[in-house]
Structures are given as structure tokens and as C-alpha cells.
Amino acid sequence: MYNFDYSKLPIKNIQKIFPIAGGYVNLSFSVDASNKKYFLKLQPNTKSNFFDYELSSLKELTDKNIPVPQIINKGELDNNSFLLLEFIENGHAYPESYRKLGKIVANMHKNINSLNLFGFSHNFNGGTIEF
């Protein structure tokens, strides 16, 4: 496991930290605190702006009433960028939920951005900015 001083995170009373598998760009963790659970994304050796595009995407989804984790904090500690989110437990999805999400995402992709192009005004793919 990557060594990181978790005591510097803006969370009080951290009790347990568990790695979560599945990501290919970031290290991910479940963080249990006294009365709350968090999802921590950590990117070693990067500046605090590493997660800026992800944050703008989450805000865009929130504006479209798509439930996403609440953004708690982001920053840089010990030369590592982090993104701290609300932890959402696994749930059950139903066919109607998939249909609704598909329609919302399709409508989002129809919109033209400030550059008079489809999609977001910035092109970001898994840790690198593409031009």
C-alpha cells in the first residue's frame, strides 16, 4: 500500500482506511470516520489541480439532477493530490433507472459548449489533457 499521512486529511476521527480496487489512474480508498464514510481518490506526485476536470464533470452531472457523490474536499498533501467524496454504498439498479440515465446523458451530449463544439469545453482523458 502507498504510504501517505492520512492524519493530514480534513477528516476528524479516522478509524479505518481500506483500499478499493478497480481504478486504473488513481489509488482509491474507503475511509471510515466516527459518523461518516468517505471515498478518497489519491494521485501520487501530482498537484492539487489534478482533479479539477473531474470536479467540473461532477458539478455538471449535479446540475442535470444526476445523483453523484457530494464533493467534500480536494487538495494536495505530501506532494499528492486528493479528492474526497461522500461514500455511496452499492445499490440495486432497475431497468427504468438505466433508461432515465441514458436519456439524461444523451441530452448532455447534444449540447454545444462555449467553443461551439459538442461535449465539454476541455478534453480530458484519464490523467492527461488531450489536444
Swiss-Prot record:
Highest taxon above the source species: Bacteria
UniProt-listed InterPro entries: Fructo-/Ketosamine-3-kinase, Kinase-like_dom_sf
Originating organism: Staphylococcus aureus
Cross-referenced PANTHER family: FRUCTOSAMINE 3 KINASE-RELATED PROTEIN, PROTEIN-RIBULOSAMINE 3-KINASE
SUPFAM superfamilies given in the database record: Protein kinase-like (PK-like) (SSF56112)
Pfam families membership: Fructosamin_kin (PF03881)
Alphabetical keyword list: Plasmid
Official protein name in the record: Uncharacterized protein in ileS 3'region
